[in-house]
Amino acid sequence: MAVQMRTMLEVADNSGARKLQMINPLGGGAGHVAHLGDVVTAAVKEASPDGTAKKGTVVKAVIVRTHKEHRRKDGTYIRFDTNAAVLINDTGEPVGTRVFGPVARELREKKFLKIVSLAPEVL
């Protein structure tokens, strides 16, 4: 099932947001479910007071970790402890300047190279 509507996501960057609630995945054909590397719209539910993202704003984010396992083409599975996302702007660049925690290799295939380069570990 991956990440569905109204799922709470941790924020894996230093944009100022701490928790997001997924509103809807962007792009056609996905229904109401988002997988690793998908772009979603989300509402900021918790934010730090000095960050750029404010509570109550609607933002775009890319899913970088999911608790539901994801099957890769070689038959292996990847699963994380949390559901997490990184905030992006309209051009697809990350809003924050740092990414915390590991991210999935699928982001490289979906052309989020800046997020992959900022991440401390790519699994």
Swiss-Prot record:
Keywords: Ribonucleoprotein, Ribosomal protein, RNA-binding, rRNA-binding. GO terms for cellular component: large ribosomal subunit. One of its GO terms (biological process) is translation. It comes from the Bacteria. SUPFAM superfamilies: Ribosomal protein L14 (SSF50193). Disulfide bonds: none annotated. GO terms for molecular function: large ribosomal subunit rRNA binding; structural constituent of ribosome. Pfam families: Ribosomal_L14. Belongs to the universal ribosomal protein uL14 family. Binds to 23S rRNA. Forms part of two intersubunit bridges in the 70S ribosome. HAMAP family: Ribosomal_uL14. Part of the 50S ribosomal subunit. Forms a cluster with proteins L3 and L19. In the 70S ribosome, L14 and L19 interact and together make contacts with the 16S rRNA in bridges B5 and B8. This is Large ribosomal subunit protein uL14. The lineage of its organism: Bacteria, Pseudomonadati, Acidobacteriota, Terriglobia, Terriglobales.
